[in-house]
UniProtKB/Swiss-Prot annotation:
UniProt keywords, alphabetically: ATP-binding, FAD, Flavoprotein, FMN, Nucleotide-binding, Nucleotidyltransferase, Transferase
Function of the molecule: Catalyzes the transfer of the AMP portion of ATP to flavin mononucleotide (FMN) to produce flavin adenine dinucleotide (FAD) coenzyme.
Cofactor(s) of this protein: a divalent metal cation
Reaction(s) catalysed by this chain's protein: FMN + ATP + H(+) = FAD + diphosphate
Annotated metabolic or biological route of this protein: Cofactor biosynthesis; FAD biosynthesis; FAD from FMN: step 1/1
GO BP annotation list: FAD biosynthetic process; FMN metabolic process
Chain residues that bind ATP: 9-10, 14-17, 92
The protein's assembly and partners: Homodimer.
Record CDD domains: cytidylyltransferase (cd02170)
Assigned EC number: 2.7.7.2
Protein name, per record: FAD synthase
């Protein structure tokens, strides 16, 4: 059985997330999704939803066999525990495949690193980014203060 791991923040679940996880599932027989904890999200604004809610939403997707919370300090701990055959990175994730492969090798984790395909919007106004969803909410519903999105960091 080929075990696949996909990981991400999965905040404000949207069709881009669903596509990523469905694509990742095609790399093997069993898909495990690791949901990042707030403490590990340093490259973009902090998640709006708590980690447990994000995990539960991801777990509800048909493509996902099991969803796990990430480790609060070391992102490689759940990967070591799951011992995957393949890790599939998201289309727009900032990680470099070679860097991830090297970090895995340093920890004695023997698995392939792949990159999921992207997905174009299928209809007008479809949003494939959590940031775009937040921006639309702020635009349509307004904000009590300037820079509300930046304040989430």
């Amino acid at each position: 059985m080929t075990r696949v791991v996909a990981q991400g923040t999965f905040d404000l679940l949207h069709p881009g997330h669903v596509h990523y996880l469905e694509d990742a599932a095609t790399y093997g027989d069993e898909l495990h999704a690791i949901v990042a904890r707030r403490t590990n999200v340093t490259h973009k604004p902090a998640p709006i939803l708590c980690a447990e809610q994000r995990r539960d939403m991801v777990a509800a997707l048909t493509a996902v066999d099991e969803a796990h919370l990430g480790h609060p300090e070391d992102v490689f701990v759940p990967i070591q525990r799951l011992d995957p055959d393949v890790i599939v990175l998201g289309f727009d994730q900032h990680h470099d495949e070679a860097d991830i492969a090297a970090a895995l090798a340093e920890r004695g984790i023997d698995c392939r690193v792949e990159r999921a395909s992207g997905r174009d919007p299928r209809y007008e106004d479809e949003l494939l980014s959590s940031g775009d969803i937040v921006d639309r909410i702020l635009k349509q519903r307004g904000s009590d203060c300037d820079g509300a999105r930046e304040g989430q960091r």
